[in-house]
Amino acid sequence: MHAPRIDLFEWLLQNAPHATYNLAFSNITGVTVEEYEALTHYSFPGNFNLGLNAQYGADELKRTLCSIYNCSSDNIVTTTGASEANFLVFSSHLNSGDEFIIEQPGYQPMWLTPELFGARRINWPRRFETKFSVDIEMLNNLITEKTKLIVLTNLHNPSGVCTHQTAIKAIAKLAEDHDVYVLVDEIYLDGSFISQPSSFGLPNVIVTSSATKIYGLGGFHSGWIIAPREITVQCQNLKAHSTGAASYPSEIMTAYILGEARELLIKRFQKRAKTNFELLKQWMNNQKEFFEWVEPDGGIVCFPKYTMDISSVDLCQYLLDTQKLLVNPGSYFNQEGFIRLSYGCDELALQSALDALEVGLRNLQGRQ
């Protein structure tokens, strides 16, 4: 099996150390140990056995997730982050010759990973002109007898647009009618500025998520699959061939903080995200010669369309070389002419980064 490189990851890993301003990473500032202990009043007892594993997931985390998703433990597979969660869903559903339908623009691993198994990608465009909304009629026309899986993110990565429950229900109904499943990666959903329930419980829907993006707990690498039991059984069996078990201490710590302080973590996120969004919105309104954009419905990423005649990779490399500013090329999300901006840093850092972005664009404009 040949594993293609994920351009987005390579771009971030190679260039982040050289950037003074970072609008590329898509997670909120992490929770500190001091914050964790203040929120949970928990620390490991001295006799805690660090040799423990939980192949079927820590009961404490499963109980917490049952409460969040109103599900049973049979509906849960705990994983090492959302990446493993998605990997297990793809590997349990797709074989060579199968087709999967994937939103575009989208998050690169969500099509490169299933292609590892010989599955054929069918692009499902989400168009800038329609504010990156999902087109249900188009989806219906894309489904064939070879279709096994429909894949989308909610909130949409890279635009931050929310797919509302009415649209998700329509997608689920199509999937049920055609006997296929829908994978909804909800890693950003708790960061929505508008109330939006999880898609779990709708027919033929599989949900994945993790504690990384919204909660500021990326170091735990705690993820999960929430799905009908026939799916979780398959994914649990496949997990024995991947990590075997996620980190038990990480799952315990995730369970305590989500159980005790999930709403506080969401408020922490929303405070930062809404403040920064207003700053970004004001900045965008003053940069119409350079950008058009669809305002995100939450999260901390957006996907503006730029007006300059330059490839997205060349533009981002220019900004890195001249301004020490790191942003992500739209081509890595399969949409040329755009960049993905993240705004989860602190407010002063965001303002400085936006100032650098404006300087870079004006300098480039003078050269063209």
Question: PLM features: residue spans?
Answer:
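Conserved glycine-rich beta-strand-loop-beta hairpin in the small C-terminal domain of fold type I
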Residues: 255, 271-281, 292-306
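PLP-dependent enzyme catalytic core of the Aspartate aminotransferase-like
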Residues: 318-327, 333-368
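Helix C-cap/helix->beta junction micro-motif
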Residues: 117, 177-178, 203, 323, ...
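N-terminal small-domain helix-loop-helix segment of the aminotransferase-like
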Residues: 1-81, 88, 260, 368
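PLP-dependent aminotransferase-like
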Residues: 92-152, 173
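Active-site PLP attachment segment
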Residues: 201-234, 247-249
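Structural signature of PLP-dependent enzymes
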Residues: 235-242, 258-281
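Active-site phosphate-binding strand-loop segment of PLP-dependent enzymes
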Residues: 128-193
